[in-house]
Amino acid sequence: MGVETIYCPDEKNQIDLKKLMADLGNRGIDSILLEGGGTLNDSALRVGIVKEVQAFVAPKLFGGVAGKTPVEGIGVELPSEAVELRYTDICQIGEDIRIRCQV
């Protein structure tokens, strides 16, 4: 199985996610699993390439002012500015709960 690197920089020399998805679409790839940190998740949501979100909730509390968030960026001031999600599936997997939503 071969591997190919696709280089899709934007004007800031970061990954142009829309361009990357268009390139993958031209190759017959219509979906990917984007598993990243808060910065990548924020970028993908902002450019509109996210169609589904899956979140896992474990029976643990971490807390802390410097705790990581699944979506970094500047956030929103009002609930009406938030990205709207629609539940499609909630299930228990072992001790965890998986929440699947459409964007």
Indicate where each model-derived feature is located.
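Enzymes that bind and transform nitrogen-containing heteroaromatic metabolites
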Residues: M1-V103
